[in-house]
Amino acid sequence: MKRMSQAFNNCLTHIKKEEELYMYQKKRNSLITMILTLTLVMGCLTGCGGGGSKGDGQSADAGGSDKKPVTLEIIRWGGGLPAQDDDIIKAEILKRLNVNIELVGYDDISDYINTVNTRIATGDYPDMFWVNQELLRNYSKKGLVMDLTDVYQNELSTVKDWLGDSLDMGVVDGKTYGIPVPISFEYCMSFIREDWLNHLGLSIPTNLDELYDVAVAFTNDDPDGNGKNDTFALTGNNGLRAFSAIFGAYGVALPTNSGALPSIYVKDGNLVSTVTDPDIKDAILEAKKFVDAGVIDPELFGNTGSQPVQDKAFQGKVGMTRIEWSLFAKDIHIEQAKAVNPDASWKPMGTIGGGNGKELDGEWQIGTPVHMFAIPATLSQSPEKKEALFKVLNYLSTEEGNRLVAYGPEGTYHQVNADGEVELINNDLWKKSDLQAYLYNYQFTGRGDESKYLIIRNPMSRDVIEFAAAQPRIKCLNGFVDFPEGFVASDAATFAEEELIKFIYGRRPIEEYDEFVKTLKEVYSYQSYLDAAGETLQSMGYIK
């Protein structure tokens, strides 16, 4: 009551000054003065007195508030960010939420990991930072990152609803620590030169025998008609993945990335891994047949990154490749390929049969996010920063907020039509702008419907995107499994990959395969990892 009385007195003083000013400027009739007085009293009591409504949520959160913006420092693995003064997404978030995000990206993942480890070791915590699953496990076990298990039920409930079951990717020892950025389908797929097939009178292969015949013809029968023996059939990035279609014919998953552990998945109701799959030996022998025929790119394991694969494909040196569609068939890649050879026609190639009837197109790690973020436990000591960060994460987990970080500011880069569908306003503006190169850095909670997003951003690639999304995959579960004590994943992964290459290339006889698995399990403690996987995945309901 005392507070209300003081507010009322303040308002009366304000009213008196207003009346004197109006009388000085010009005479007002008593009715106008009365209306003005009543208006001022009501305005002061509701605005100055502090007991009224704040109005709608958007204006309460917007940058138009007199309240000083809260600054958040976020660091991540990622590149392409402009100078902060030129960052229009930063400016939009500041305007909409009154939060100033200072986002720093590191192009090189090794540099990033060294930086974040150093900062955390010295207590110099950012307000949020990028993690992979190994970093998340290490930090969570040391109590360095915030436990979000209960937070997702309360302050971050909007994020929880947005991400759904994907939150399982951020779980360590039964508690949720990560903010995962999920991917709704596997990008890696096979492509083939349709014009080479037409020149040779062949069709896109659908089984192993046809694949072998096409591979031999692409290597030996001058598919480009230049009169030279200068082509190979098959290449890919990340090493062993080039053989994914062959192994997929047996339902065997090969790790998508070089240096990764053998894939973990359920087959015929049983938990298996790449190296323990009962069909692995047959798949190895089939792949060896292609190697022995000389149809594989001899520089296959030197293809670091996507550039060598793009160069060989677009320059007409290979006729089949295994690579992420996003590194090979986006609008920009289609234009690059046509610039080199307007007649070149690359088409998606589906699953290959003829093995054991599985016909699956490689692995899809459903437990592994494409990106993930963690919040330092120390942020709980800064309530204002924590509230601001949660505000940002919740906002980006709404349709409106997600459109901002998916397509740029509405009205300039995209619009929503009468049917509620997003349309890019000016595709030329997209191509000229650096916005498309750095938007993903702000997608802290993903981008909703992945296929829809990708088609809007890459309209020329619609057929490829829909093809990739529809491919049947081997759903792999490595991301859900914590490493047991004493298990050095990198050593086990390196040994397994090196030995598989030896078997495929005939440098080690298949008769020694069981000995290899025994060594992996015992010397490299791989059995402890399989045991941990069985326990975890049974608790999650993937196996009985």
Predicted features by range, described:
Residues 1-4:
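Methionine residue identity
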Residues 7:
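Basic Arg/Gly/Lys-rich low-complexity intrinsically disordered segments
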Residues 10-12, 16, 20, 24-25, ...:
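Extracytoplasmic/secretory soluble proteins
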